[in-house]
Amino acid sequence: MENFMRIDSKESYENAVATLNAWAKAYYDDDAPIASDEEYDALYHEVLAYEQVNPAQKSLFSPTTRIGGGVSEGFSKARHIKQMWSMEDIFSQLELVAWLKRGEKQNLSFVAEPKFDGASLNLLYEKGMLVRAITRGDGITGEEVTQNARVIKSIPLNISYDGRIEIRGEVVIKKADFDAINEERTRNGETLLSNPRNAAAGSLRQLDSAVTAKRKLLFIPWGVGEQNLGLAKHSEVMKFVRDLGFYRDDFFKILDADGLAGAYNELLKQRDEKDVMMDGMVIRVDDLARCEELGYTVKFPKFMVAFKFPAIEKTTRLLDVALQVGRSGVVTPVGVLDEVVIDGARVKSATLHNFDEIERLGVMKNDLISIIRSGDVIPKITSVFKERRDGTQTPIIRPKFCPECGSHLLDEGVFIKCQNLNCRARVINSIIHYASKKCLNIDGLGEAIINLLYEKGLISRVIDIYSLKFEDLMALEGFKDKKAQNLLDAIEASKGASLARFITGLGCEHIGEVAAKKIAQNFGEGWLEADFDEVKNLEGFGEEMANSLMDFIEVNKDEILALQSIVRPSFERKQITQNAFSGKSVVITGTLSRPRDEIKAELEGYGAKVVGSVSKKTDFVLAGSNAGSKLQKAVELGVRVIDEGEFERLKLEI
């Protein structure tokens, strides 16, 4: 992250306060951030540190004295009965220890639960009925969005409690639902939503509640405001709230101070698997009387804190755009970044997908941008901070010539393609794909070796790897007897690979591992003779996939037959006896004793369809430890849940 502001004087302090207020307005009020969370947090803490050293200079407008944002003119104002406080953020174990020492909290009992990344909402119930819903706003006053709250299915319109109670929580969008929304917006030619948090906030504040209803928002309760329950502990209050019919997350722990670090690390490991975006863990003193004793600062409760996760979204600068040519000839733009570290990984590049995406983002070279990285997925650009341009930016031009071979490119709109079948990049990437683990799995034949073999004129197409000789390899730099023989042995071992792997390795557009497996299972050695209708009618296929395969076979049939005669791929038509899993839909979740891919392959061998999400159509959920929300949904829907022990018992019946 660039160091955009150094606070070493009253003037630089006031500039920093103004910058933070502008960023906060964009984030809270406009739902259009112009800085990343990490960038805001870093500058916020610099301002706070300056104020602690120079209290007399503290501005009345400093964000360290305020909570959240203001109120949009599109909604009427409404006051919370009890103030909705923000939480203090901490970012390390040392800060956690310091927080525990303040107020002598070391020997207390705590509740630990996820900090979901969404939009806070306060629900007021009177005599069992939902009467008002208010956004956080500035903590005192928010926007009344009652009509929109009523169309969120996870918010009960009535509850079995007659008293007056404010139930607070986070409005979020599940990752899968967010992706589905953007897919639909892409089809409709609409601007894509930048991330689930902004999507949730924007959806909650729609003037048309019909739009809110379509967004599949989820309300996750995390506390109460006004209440007369007479309960002694926060954990008891939350059990009461969830028993009223509100969403119940599976991570909710009551523990002492010694267990907090372990709980944080456990939750951090679930970050990518969770259905909903999390950005930390909330730690709260469980004893409500002790909470009252600890009290509040001007902004934060002293009895709770947000232990933030390492940022997966950061601000950096787009230095350039590199062009990559794939095996199908598609030219893909890749953003070259000023290096940043995200969750321990050094990030120098980000996907830009295609040139239509560049135009949609409106991004230029040397722009400040926000990037997000999740798991091992290639980072992507989520925001462009156009308001912070300084005149050094230059436009990104659609290419007309292949960056590898110089051929004139075919511009089809979304895709720009090199049509030269002998283009170096196309050839090399085709061979890399063929030799990869998910295809023919030729150990030792990686990108560097393939490039070397190509440069020396030893290979120019996939089939050439089967003509390599010992003396060819020994003539190359870095090869000795053992390395050369090992590579030849690995190439020989690829012969007889499964037909599904062979088809995957050919690299036909739209035909991946799953599709190749279905082609092999249904057509066997006659797969090249399958007609359009037969392919189109396979489960999960359609006209686009069938056309792609037919066109690929028509152009490359002679080459495929020659390669197939050397590899002689094996195949086995599916002969599945009736069993507990045949024809069933199965979801795998949690940590299991064997790799998930291994169990998935075994289930598919029994005729099961392994899917990624739980629905009413799911027949089994195979759950390991730390199973998460998929297990919870299975229980709610009445789907049969089995553990590994029951899985093994059911297999014995096959």
UniProtKB/Swiss-Prot annotation:
Instruction: Report the CDD domains cross-referenced here.
Output: BRCT_DNA_ligase_like, LIGANc
Keyword Glycoprotein (UniProt): no
Under the heading SMART domains, the entry gives:
BRCT, HhH1, LIGANc
InterPro entries membership: BRCT_dom, BRCT_dom_sf, DisA/LigA_HHH, DNA_ligase, DNA_ligase_AS, DNAligase_adenylation, DNAligase_N, Hlx-hairpin-Hlx_DNA-bd_motif
Q: Name one GO molecular function term.
A: DNA binding
Which positions are annotated as binding Zn(2+)? 402, 405, 418, 423
Q: Does the keyword Glycoprotein apply?
A: no
Q: Could you say which protein family the record assigns here?
A: Belongs to the NAD-dependent DNA ligase family. LigA subfamily.
- What name appears for this protein in its UniProt entry? DNA ligase
Task: Quote the gene name from the UniProt entry.
Answer: ligA
